[in-house]
Swiss-Prot record:
This is Uncharacterized protein At1g31060. Residues 36-46, 74-85 have a biased composition (Low complexity). The lineage of its organism: Eukaryota, Viridiplantae, Streptophyta, Embryophyta, Tracheophyta. Residues 24-49, 65-87 are annotated as: Disordered. Residues 24-35 have a biased composition (Polar residues).
Length: 106
C-alpha cells in the first residue's frame, strides 16, 4: 500500500509512506511530484536490489532522497543537466515495516 502526502511545512516536499511486510528491497516504484507556484514537475523512483533510480522531467534539478525510520539514511545525486536520470547507490536501508521517503528538489 502506498500513501502520498505533502509535508505541511513546505510545498517543495512530497512525502511517501511505504507500508510493506517484507523488507526494504520490496520497495518497487513510486512517483513524486515537485509542487511549485507555476507547475508540477514529475519524477519517478524505482528500486532494484541496491540501486535506486530517480528520473525527472527537469534533470537540471538536484535530487535529495532520504529514508527515515529507526535510523536516518540519505541518498543524493549531484546536478546532471545533460542527463534525464540520476542513479543513486544505496549503502543500506534499515528493514522496517514503515519507511518514510522524501524527495526534494533543491
Amino acid at each position: 500500500m502506498l500513501r502520498e502526502e505533502c509535508t505541511p511545512s513546505s510545498s517543495w516536499w512530497e512525502d511517501v509512506q511505504h507500508h510493506h511486510n517484507d523488507h526494504a528491497n520490496s520497495i518497487s516504484s513510486t512517483s513524486f511530484y515537485h509542487k511549485s507556484s507555476n507547475n508540477n514537475s514529475h519524477a519517478n523512483a524505482s528500486c532494484e536490489e541496491d540501486n535506486l533510480s530517480v528520473s525527472t522531467v527537469r534533470a537540471s534539478n538536484r535530487l535529495d532522497l532520504t529514508a527515515e525510520s529507526s535510523n536516518h539514511h540519505s541518498l543524493s545525486a549531484s546536478n546532471q543537466p545533460a542527463s534525464s536520470s540520476d542513479e543513486l547507490l544505496r549503502d543500506h536501508v534499515v528493514s522496517s515495516h514503515n519507511h518514510l521517503w522524501s524527495l526534494a528538489f533543491l
